[in-house]
Amino acid sequence: MIDKYKIVSLVLTLSLIAALVRLVYSTNIAGPSAPQDDKASVLKIIHERKSVRSFTEQPVSREQLDTLVRAAMAAPTGKNMQPWKFIVIDDKEAMTQLSEQLPYAKMLKEAQAAVIVCGDMSVVDDNGKPSTNWVMDCSAATENLLLAAEAMGLGAVWTGVYPYEERLEAVKKAFNLPDNIIPLNMVPIGYPKGEQHPKDKYKPDNIHYNGW
């Protein structure tokens, strides 16, 4: 006669084994898929980034601004010189005044904050020479900042300062910048007003493989 308790014990054991098999299988499946999801998210952010020039009155916190600048500083630089400085502005009066001096940056009146990305000529290499790549390095930092803003649900736009003399003078004067600091651009930041759509800039004709 079959012991019913042994049968129950056997069923429970088999159920436990089946559960463990499912757990191991699902873990193996989920492992490789997670990076794929991350890649998809990164590519989505890159392709959805857009220049936002109109903002709501919703404030942007200093914690959010710090996150943006941290992302900017994660950019690559020649010789790892990191020849940059970042001026974070969340003073509405200062931004309004600057928007009146810089006709191309009228969106500063609506923005809740801005970041000025600057090259620092006091940063030198092992030979005592300042970076010759500061424009490229600071541009990479700016793109990181713009992508981070997109990922955080914020809007931003790259407004050029360098190499326009009148813009350089206006920004340097407004923020008392020393001679070794050159503002490359200014990025107004805020929450987008209305629906914004990215532009599809992909053009196959611009691609050449293995030569022209």
Describe the residue ranges of each PLM region.
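Acidic, surface-exposed loops and disordered segments
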Residues: 1-212
